[in-house]
Every structure is written in structure tokens, then in C-alpha cells.
Amino acid sequence: VAWDGNVVASLSATGQPGFRIFGADAQALRGKLESAGAIPATAGEVRTVRIENGRPRYGDDIFETSLPQETQQMHAISFNKGCYLGQEIVERIRARGHVNRKLVRMEIDAREVVSGAKVVAGGAEVGDVTSAVWSPRSGKTVALGYVRVPHCEAGSSVEVGGASAVVF
């Protein structure tokens, strides 16, 4: 939508309702929005809300090799559209199979968790963390990560870096 010489799009990086505004003079636009009562968010705040809401980000949580069924982003796939790169494997999984891991949100009883930390259940490695951040709202670290399907159910208990964690 055109607005005051800019383009406004309903896009959310956090999983909450949001907008992206594209324009030539970002400083002037920011000043107008702040004078109208808008409160700017830092990149760190946006990242925290994104992870708290389980919203994956390409490059952090979704990769070139990720399958839509793993990332739980099926709303982004059309099974009625013509050919596209990767269609055969995506359709084969939908029609006959399943994935072995899924991207899930976790809350971890630890102050700091790094990307790449291993997720463990019953003494065996069952996944890894892709994004993690301390959540002031929950008082825990919230994280996104790929976890093997048997441990993906909400409420499943796992460990990350030796700390207790729960899948949501």
C-alpha cells in the first residue's frame, strides 16, 4: 500500500502483527512515526519476540537444505502449483512419508544457550538448537531447534547443555 511516498506491507518478523515500511528517507519517516506514538524496537528485541513466538528465520533456523515439513511452514507451500525446484521430494514426503526431525520451540532452564547446542533425551542426542535468547517474559532461555520426531510433542522433556528443557 502506498503511504506518504512510501510502501507499507503487512509483514511480520516476529509472529505478531506487524508492518514493514519501505521508503527513501528512513530518518524522516522514523521521526513521523515516533511523533505519532510509535515505539521503535531494537534488533535484539525483535529477535527475542521472534524466538518467543516460535517464528523461524531463514539463515538462522531455515536453511537451503531444510524441508517445509521439517520447518513446519506448510502454509508457504502449494501442492496445486506447477513445477518448482524441490517439488518432487516435498510431494513424496507429503504423499508417502514423514520427516525424521522438526523445528520446535523450547524453554530451557539455563541463562545462556548457544546456537548449535545439542538437544539430548534419555542420554542420546536428538537434535540441536538453531536460535536461542534469554526471555524476560518467561524468565528462561527460549530457543528454536530441530528435534527428532519422537521428542517433538509439546511437553516433551529434553536437556540442552545439561539444563532441563521443555518442548512447546
Cite the ranges covered by each PLM segment:
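A near-ubiquitous, low-amplitude feature marking generic local secondary-structure context
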Residues: E34-G37, P56, I62-F63, A76, ...
